[in-house]
């Protein structure tokens, strides 16, 4: 019973999904502590908000408050190995231990869950939907997979709204713990084959997820996916996409750094919506978020205002410099289909500019499974700088490195492989028009220094 526990201990406290739960338990007045492998801006924020976090794998650092097994809940992320010393201590001593996804499922079961699932697009779409609800007369609680730029957090709380917006993560089948009232499914391009084994098993996981949507609710699925939904009786199915489906956009106008669209629903049309983050892919993300909002009573005017005031998500098309001569942004894209969408959206905005990307592959298994697809997507760029693979939870795989991607890039593309720490020196000598940092690893830690370098160079040239 989550209400009666007094302390919560997190093994892997710095993950984006874990941090939303930490903030939730802090808001409930619980004593919160945990371990993470490395300090980050996120863990420092959590400490400032009241959590106790340490960075050594050491049982003696677990606070006494968290050693009372009758009053302590232990939450861990699948990225943490079972032999981790602290996790092993809790297992050996009979503590109640749950995965993050199980705890999230328990917390949200009593509310109307508005979930967003899919290989990619789910963080932006769920954050956009949360903003549409939060700024409307309805409100919402939200557990997000990224930091909302509107609110500076990945957790929104409402004491009155029946709705909870949830990013539904398919990794480790986490989303099977949820009980959605409604769900968007954005994409089902195979991923996490280290967990699923085959593309068919990955699709089957999404099919099972559709069976969890509650009668009276709805599935809003992107038109054209390979997935065959298997919903319960009483669950409506709607389709959406950029250009067709029950929900779609018309009269799309892109120019002068702005995007305007008309939103078309089965029973309404909202004209002249301005996208607060004017990137091509946000047309489709926006259609899904607006569909969720419209079906649950957010008014047309509130939708229009919310789309215009949406400021985006950290590390998702996150512009750091935007001038006539120089553009620099970072984007979390780490799957081949996602990278292709990112590059096409950037190309749409900057047709005549040279586009350079620094890409850090994320996971050895993903690189092994998709290196040719990564090369195809990155070949849409003018120049590619590859860094070493970010391992996250994995051990190296013999023969798997960034060189696999490098060797399969299209002939004629400018390309190099560079150590992370050498990137600033490399960029100092390069003419840059549009630069994008791609990936879900720790390359983002270098973004502030790259920003300073490019700003200094721009100032010295002006």
Regions found by a protein language model. Name each.
Residues 1-115, 128-130, 244, 248, ...:
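Short, basic phosphate-binding NTP loop
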Residues 2-7, 17, 24, 28, ...:
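Nucleotide phosphate-binding/pyrophosphate-handling subdomain across enzymes
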Residues 7, 72-73, 182, 218, ...:
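Structural motif
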Residues 24-30, 47, 61-66, 78-221, ...:
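Phosphate-binding loop of NTP-binding sites
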Residues 30-37, 219-223, 356-359, 381-391:
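Short internal beta-strands
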Residues 49, 236, 375-433:
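C-terminal helical cap/extension that packs against the catalytic core
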Residues 70-71, 422-453:
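A glycine-rich beta-strand to alpha-helix segment
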Residues 95, 201, 209-216, 341-350, ...:
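P-loop/Walker A phosphate-binding loop and immediately adjacent motor/lid segment at beta-alpha junctions
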């Amino acid at each position: 019973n989550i209400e009666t526990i007094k302390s919560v201990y997190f093994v892997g406290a710095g993950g984006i999904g874990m941090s939303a739960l930490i903030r939730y338990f802090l808001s409930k007045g619980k004593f919160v502590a945990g371990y993470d492998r490395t300090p980050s801006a996120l863990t420092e924020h959590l400490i400032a908000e009241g959590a106790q976090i340490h960075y050594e794998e050491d049982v003696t650092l677990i606070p006494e408050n968290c050693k009372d097994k009758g009053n302590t809940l232990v939450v861990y992320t699948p990225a943490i190995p079972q032999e981790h010393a602290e996790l092993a201590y809790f297992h050996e001593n009979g503590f109640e231990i749950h995965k993050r996804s199980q705890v999230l499922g328990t917390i949200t079961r009593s509310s109307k869950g508005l979930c967003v699932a899919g290989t990619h697009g789910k963080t932006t779409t769920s954050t956009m939907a949360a903003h549409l609800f939060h700024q409307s007369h309805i409100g919402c609680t939200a557990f997000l997979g990224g930091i909302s730029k509107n609110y500076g957090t990945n957790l929104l709380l409402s004491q009155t709204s029946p709705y909870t917006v949830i990013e539904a993560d398919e990794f480790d089948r986490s989303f099977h713990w949820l009980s959605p009232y409604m769900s968007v499914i954005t994409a089902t391009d195979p991923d996490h084959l280290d967990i699923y084994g085959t593309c068919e098993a990955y699709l089957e996981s999404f099919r099972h997820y559709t069976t969890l949507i509650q009668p009276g609710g709805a599935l809003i699925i992107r038109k054209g996916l390979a997935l065959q939904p298997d919903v319960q009786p009483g669950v409506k199915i709607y389709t959406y996409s950029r250009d067709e489906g029950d929900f779609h956009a018309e009269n799309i106008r892109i120019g002068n750094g702005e995007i305007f669209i008309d939103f078309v629903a089965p029973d309404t049309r909202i004209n002249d919506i301005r996208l607060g983050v004017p990137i091509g892919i946000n047309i489709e993300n926006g259609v899904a978020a607006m569909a969720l909002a419209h079906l649950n009573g957010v008014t047309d005017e509130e939708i229009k205002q919310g789309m215009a005031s949406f400021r985006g998500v950290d590390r998702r098309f996150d512009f750091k410099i935007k001038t006539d001569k120089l553009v620099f942004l970072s984007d979390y894209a780490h799957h081949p289909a996602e990278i292709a969408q990112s590059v096409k959206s950037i190309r749409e905005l900057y047709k005549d500019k040279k586009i350079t990307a620094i890409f850090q592959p994320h996971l050895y298994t993903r690189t092994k499974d998709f290196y040719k697809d990564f090369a195809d997507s990155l070949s849409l760029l003018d120049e590619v700088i590859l860094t070493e693979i970010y391992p996250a939870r994995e051990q190296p795989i013999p023969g798997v490195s960034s060189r696999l991607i490098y060797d399969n890039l299209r002939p004629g593309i400018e390309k190099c492989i560079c150590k992370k720490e050498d990137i600033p020196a490399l960029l100092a000598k390069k003419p840059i028009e549009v630069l994008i940092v791609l990936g879900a690893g720790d390359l983002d830690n270098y973004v502030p220094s790259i920003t300073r370098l490019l700003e200094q160079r721009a100032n010295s040239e002006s």
